[in-house]
């Protein structure tokens, strides 16, 4: 009986996963980062992180596919004498996909992002249905966040979530320190790549509900337009939010405008000028601070949450040679109220200034081989270029990242 059962199982697997339908991969990423306040090397902070990510893909008959990936990461902080080494396991993207002509079904742990990439962006557990038509593409999905790894989910909508988000994983209190806050979100999207032959359109309605016993819910109406011309790309987007908290409904706003100039060079290069805005609390409190579901870091040094902030940025991205590319950006940070953003460089004292300062950052990416990539980045944040806390220390950061891939 046991032999018969094993034989039937083998036949089922062979029929399900057709020949040459398997694929394995492995990625190892090693990061080293240091912060030097005011170029004082005696106050240098050093941080190391590595991530090992295996993946497996397979076809499920003629219409489906399976993707499984996981991650084991370690974090080390040599300056922390109490707990300088932590190993963290994680289930990353793991989903099944079935295609039935114009209808596509995706279920499991998947990546999702709103049209602007500022409200919800990352891994979520749930299902997504997509329909492709000649009039555009329609998607509808629902997801849950409470089983995600907290540090990857980056859900910090409330002050309690913000505080707990900075805690390290404690295996003696695993459930309270590992998992992300419990929230349910649902979204309906529409996009058309070329309306009238030249206009790209994306729009979505997204709602998130507190499933962890709290009472903070929010809804988002987002739209993004893209107009590609011969050597210029114009992007315009906006988000209208309703925040429900303690029985009160407050509107909030965000906007994103970008102008990208494609340079007439042999190797791809472009310059981008952009402005990103998120409302702060108005004086009469009729408008609230924009509150995204996930925290998408703004800047490479400040890594600010897009809430009550505006950013003006001028950046360059391009290939210097076939295996070598570079990025450089100048970003200026402005507060839109005096109470929402209370982090570096305004962590101490009362500040009446709105201008936080400027970040200058550059990165080199060297594709040494198809399976080895080296990233080197460095930059500074200069509070003296603003009036919020001009006497605060300059913060210098250096990042080194090496990625090894086996396909």
For each of these PLM feature ranges, what is it?
Residues 237, 246-319, 323-349:
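Extracellular/periplasmic loop regions
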Residues 53-57, 95-97, 128-130, 185-191, ...:
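Outer-membrane beta-barrel architecture
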Residues 35-38, 139-212, 238-252, 275-291, ...:
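Outer-membrane beta-barrel translocator/channel fold
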């Amino acid at each position: 009986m046991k032999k018969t059962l094993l034989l039937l199982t083998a036949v089922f697997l062979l029929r399900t996963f057709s020949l040459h339908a398997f694929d394995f991969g492995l990625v190892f990423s090693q990061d080293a980062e240091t912060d030097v306040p005011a170029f004082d090397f005696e106050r240098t902070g050093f941080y190391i992180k590595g991530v090992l990510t295996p993946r497996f893909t397979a076809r499920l008959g003629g219409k489906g596919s399976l993707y499984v990936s996981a991650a084991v990461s370690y974090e080390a902080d040599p300056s922390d004498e109490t707990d300088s080494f932590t190993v963290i396991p994680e289930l990353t993207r793991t989903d099944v996909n079935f295609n039935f002509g114009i209808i596509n079904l995706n279920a499991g742990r998947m990546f999702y992002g709103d049209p602007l990439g500022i409200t919800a962006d990352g891994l979520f557990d749930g299902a997504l249905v997509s329909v492709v038509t000649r009039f555009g593409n329609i998607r509808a999905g629902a997801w849950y966040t409470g089983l995600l790894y907290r540090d990857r989910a980056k859900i910090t909508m409330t002050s309690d979530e913000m505080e707990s988000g900075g805690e390290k994983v404690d295996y003696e209190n695993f459930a309270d320190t590992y998992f992300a806050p419990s929230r349910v979100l649902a979204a309906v999207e529409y996009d058309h790549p070329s309306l009238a032959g030249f206009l790209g359109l994306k729009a979505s309605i997204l709602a998130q509900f507190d499933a962890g016993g709290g009472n903070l819910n929010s809804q988002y109406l987002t739209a993004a337009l893209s107009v590609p011309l011969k050597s210029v790309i114009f992007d315009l987007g906006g988000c209208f939010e309703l925040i429900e908290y303690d029985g009160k409904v407050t509107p909030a706003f965000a906007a994103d405008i970008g102008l990208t100039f494609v340079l007439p060079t042999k190797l791809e290069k472009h310059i981008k000028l952009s402005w990103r805005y998120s409302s702060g609390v108005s004086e009469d409190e009729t408008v609230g601070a924009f509150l995204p579901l996930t925290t998408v870091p703004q800047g490479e040094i400040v890594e600010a949450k897009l809430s009550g902030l505006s950013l003006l940025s001028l950046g360059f991205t391009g290939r210097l040679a076939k295996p070598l590319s570079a990025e450089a950006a100048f970003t200026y940070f402005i507060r839109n109220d005096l109470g929402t953003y209370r982090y570096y460089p305004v962590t101490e004292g009362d500040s009446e200034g709105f201008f936080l300062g400027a970040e200058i950052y550059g990165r080199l990416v060297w594709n040494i081989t198809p399976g080895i990539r080296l990233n080197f980045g460095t930059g500074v944040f200069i509070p003296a270029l603003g009036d919020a806390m001009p006497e605060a220390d300059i913060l210098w950061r250096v990042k080194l990242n090496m990625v090894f891939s086996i396909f």
